[in-house]
Amino acid sequence: MRIITFSALACAAAILAGCVTERSYGQAQEIVRGSPAARQDAINKCAMGVNAGSASRRAEIARIINVSPRSNVGRTYCTRAFNGIASGRITYEDFRKRSPQFIRVVQGR
């Protein structure tokens, strides 16, 4: 069980990290949809990654998602994104292309 949980979280956290296949996106979507604890872990890992980035990158993300650069940009972005993925508001294609729908969701609209 522990190995499955670790790999599930790794899959979910990888969603916002880069190249993701449609299959792995679907797997991660089901994980974060069905497990609030797994979603929170994925958000935490994602936020740490965003917050570890450069100040200019965080400022750019803050502008896009309409928050102050002094706020917890990573947590806001990742929470909105993973909630959108879990709810189905962000599809694989939206995610892959960073579509207007993806942007609306991470902006909190």
Locations of regions flagged by a protein language model:
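Non-membrane alpha-helical secondary structure
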Residues: M1, S35-A38, G53, R57
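Bacterial N-terminal signal peptides that target proteins for export
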Residues: M1-A8
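Hydrophobic alpha-helical segments
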Residues: A10, I43, R75-C78
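C-terminal motif of bacterial Sec signal peptides marking the signal peptidase cleavage site
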Residues: I15-G18
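Bacterial signal peptide processing site
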Residues: V20-R23
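Post-signal peptide N-terminal segment of mature Sec-exported envelope proteins
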Residues: Q27-V50
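Compact alpha-helical subdomains of small soluble proteins
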Residues: G53-R109
